[in-house]
A protein has these predicted regions:
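C-terminal catalytic "cap/lid" subdomain
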Residues: 1-229
């Protein structure tokens, strides 16, 4: 059994590196794998606050910035987070961090960690590409908000959390174009590919370990959003 998890940078490092969370997250994963050592997990790390701080700084330094430059900066932040998570998952993670899901790579351990890839592609997109590569029909997206909302909850007090949504309706919310540093519930390009692949996605606040454990145990009584075709 394989689980593919997008671990948002805002979960790893909301204001500072979330050491206790990473320990608890590791404990949950180790427990799940030790129940059946054939189980495997792929973790794709986002850049989060670190990426946005560097990107925002660069935009101020060079107002004539190009989006590819911003993406390259953000990708490096995902790689830093990936190294931290990869090393934290020893001894069940023994393979090198993957930065290109289109290439062949080793997956000898129980846990594989991946980072950002190249300009124009978010870690959401990479998560969906891993699902395609391994013929998995579902993914888990761990973010720092409880659910997907019908509009930005940081801007609108009347934003409503959605327990279920289709990929088509999500596309209407997130739009069709990806911009570096975007703080969307899911990357628009990844949304389009996920619809094509008929994926099921669980989106939830990764900081709530007990809630995440419900998803691991296939208990649909969790706080979050399920995305389906």
């Amino acid at each position: 059994m394989l689980k593919i998890i997008s671990l948002g940078g805002g979960v790893i490092n909301p204001d500072k590196i979330n050491i206790e969370y990473i320990k608890n997250f590791r404990n949950l994963i180790f427990k799940w794998i030790k129940e059946d050592n054939r189980r495997k997990i792929i973790l794709i790390t986002g850049g989060g606050k670190t990426a946005r701080e560097y990107q925002d700084s660069y935009k101020q330094i060079n107002p004539a910035f190009e989006n590819d430059d911003l993406d390259e900066i953000g990708i490096e932040a995902t790689k830093l987070n990936a190294q931290l998570i990869s090393k934290s998952m020893k001894p069940l993670c023994i393979d090198e961090v993957v930065s290109d899901p289109s290439q062949d790579f080793n997956f000898k351990g129980n846990i594989l960690v991946a980072s950002g890839w190249k300009p124009g592609f978010s870690t959401d997109y990479i998560t969906v590409k891993f699902a395609e590569k391994f013929k998995s029909n579902e993914i888990i997206n761990l973010t720092n908000v409880n659910q997907i909302y019908d509009k930005d909850p940081k801007k609108f007090n009347d934003a409503k959390g959605l327990s279920n949504i289709t990929w088509k309706k999500l596309q209407d919310i997130v739009g069709k174009n990806w911009e570096p540093g975007s703080n969307l519930p899911f990357d628009p390009i990844a949304t389009k590919l996920a619809l094509k692949l008929d994926l099921k996605a669980y989106v939830l606040n990764g900081l709530d370990i007990k809630n995440l454990e419900k998803v691991f145990n296939k208990n649909d009584d969790f706080l979050g959003t399920i995305i389906v075709k």
